[in-house]
Amino acid sequence: YNRLAIQRLCKDAKVLDCFTHTGSFALNAGIAGASSVLGVDASELAIKQAEKNAELNGLSDRVRFMNRDVFALLPELEKQGEKFDMVILDPPAFTKSRSSVKNAVKGYREINLRGMKLVKDGGFLATCSCSHFMDYELFTKTIAQAARNVHVRLRQVEFRTQSPDHPILWAADESYYLKFYIFQVCREY
């Protein structure tokens, strides 16, 4: 569902997929015609499966994977002057309880700030939170704060929640857990 949403923006694009796990966003970018895709994840096992998935889909020539900690890699890529047409941030839940929301906000702010720095002017950022405790307002505020910190303007292209097979039950707040944005990133002048 959300993986399909990025496809229309990936034709001929250079894509960075952070927290790729088994590569589903990266593979969808490759299928959509991205010129190159780099998927990054800290799990060696997940990266091995992602590489197999790329091979099974005939994408090994354009979609590659790296077993690295995203928080450590993004500053290195920035220092090297790397820029991407699209950066995808799909981290695991940074909080699974109300007591750790403050630390989660720091993590989401940092990862979004780093991701925005790597997007070419006019490129795209897809960013997600799969934590129920990181509600819509707080996630949105955190992204806006990251954008101010790096002096970029965000133009919201799309907002989604989880796919229809994970319905949101109004009587169960915890069922509204996924927030998924696509932004166009514009440098402020």
Predicted regions and their residues:
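S-adenosyl-L-methionine
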Residues: 45-88
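Conserved SAM-binding loop of SAM-dependent methyltransferases across substrates and taxa
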Residues: 22-35
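SAM-dependent Rossmann-like transferase core, predominantly class I methyltransferases
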Residues: 1-13
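Mobile active-site "lid"/loop adjacent to the S-adenosyl-L-methionine
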Residues: 84-114
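Helix-to-beta-strand junctions that scaffold the AdoMet/dcAdoMet cofactor pocket
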Residues: 59, 119-121
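C-terminal catalytic and target-recognition region of SAM-dependent MTase-like enzymes
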Residues: 110, 124-189
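Conserved class I S-adenosyl-L-methionine
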Residues: 12-21
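Conserved SAM-binding motif I beta-strand of class I
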Residues: 36-41
